[in-house]
Amino acid sequence: MTHGIRRKFSSLITRHTSLMKHDDHQAGRILTRREALAVLGGTVLLASGVSPRPGMAQTPPSCIVTPEQMEGPFFTDVRLNRSDIRSDPTDKSVKEGVPLALTLRVSAVGSTGCTPLAGATVDVWHCDAAGVYSDSSGNTAGKKFLRGHQVTGANGAARFTTIYPGWYPGRAVHIHFKVRILAGPALGNEFTSQLYFDEAVTDRVLARAPYSVRGQRTRNSDDGLYRRGGGRLMLALTESGTGYAGEFSIGLKT
């Protein structure tokens, strides 16, 4: 697929560009309530932490305003259709870390609310506990750990088994994701953003091995990209066994 024929999901944003560290930048902004009303013809999108005024219509929880953020320099189109992304297919090694069961729910937003979007390809990638991405440089070239995609089912869900990400200087703990339509009349549509983590949970995770050997991390408040919409991209986490389960719902205007 060439850049010239890529069409982006509007994802209820307006466009602008702002350069960030590590070649990351935010590619959109969160709509105001007035703008969301205009887009949806009276349907209100609920963003995290925002309550509607009394008497104002509400949409299902899956209808949220999702700011777009650039994929950064570490995306590779590996086309690895797998749910468990912890291993590297080149040598079968498995990345150590606190388990994370990740569910992304993709919905198409219309004038009457949200409908689960089936058949969307959802890519996920992130760094390991040491803050290193696969297939980025040096001894990770050709590696594919902590990368993969799933195709959403009838309920719009894509599920992954992974680990809690580490961090690297200048960036808070985060996960990258990309939603793509690779078949059908909407072929070429895509939407890219990032997910962030609650600081208290991250503090507990990073106190455990193999994360604990590292120094002081970059916190959400010190991440310039997080400050531009990251509060609306927080992964909802619950404890699950020795790790966590996380969910995030993505409302896209296709």
Annotate each language-model stretch with its function:
Residues 29-35, 44-62:
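N-terminal twin-arginine translocation
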Residues 59-228, 247, 251-254:
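Beta-strand-dominated extracellular/periplasmic modules and repeats
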Residues 1-31, 42-48:
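N-terminal secretory signal peptides
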Residues 165-168, 235-241:
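Exposed beta-sheet edge/beta-hairpin loop segments within beta-rich domains
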Residues 14, 54-56, 75:
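Intrinsically disordered, low-complexity segments enriched in proline/serine/threonine
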Residues 226-238:
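Low-complexity, intrinsically disordered Gly/Pro/Thr-rich segments
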